[in-house]
Amino acid sequence: MRKIFGHRGLPQTYVENTITSLNKALKICDFIETDVRITRDEQLVLYHDSTIENKKIEELTLSEITMFTDIDLSEMHFVSRDQIKGNANFELKINTEEDDLNKIFIKKITNLTNPDDIISSFDWETILNNREIFKCKYGILIDKENQLFESKAISNLDPKLMFMVEKEIFYSRNFELPKERCVVWTVNDSDEIMNILNMNVYGVVTDIGDKL
């Protein structure tokens, strides 16, 4: 079945990446896509931007983050898989070279996933090096055409690897990835969404899940 992914929930109606936005999207979408980061005190937060008030998320504690945002802590602090009421694509935002913190990040998110979830990242190395650890699907993000050749080679070696592909790259004449393992992002025209789904991709990420 082809899937609709709510991009950070329903961002045109609710604050993106909040638990409320994600769960509202899951009432009408097959999946949600959300960004995950780790704090200095080893807590997971659902947040897209790498910084708050010019301070890296990874350099702030959870309590410090609450001082710089109006978002309620309960809406962004990810501690239990029960908080999200459906399938999720967790995009890992890796923004530190601290190996110990990254290892904790992987361990924590792995323990918070269901088998049908997806763990993905722009950091290919993190995904590829932890494939044996993940308890769910896993994928790499592609937003540059020059990544297509390498990702195609990897796809031949790993039949489980998924590909989260930026829309314009999906349309490239050099695109040869297995479509049934591709999730295309971010598509906000309803006709275009249906056209891409009809190409037998795994899914499409959209901001307009509530308008389809």
Where are the language model's segments positioned?
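Phosphate-group recognition and catalysis centered on beta-loop-alpha active-site segments
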Residues: 1-212
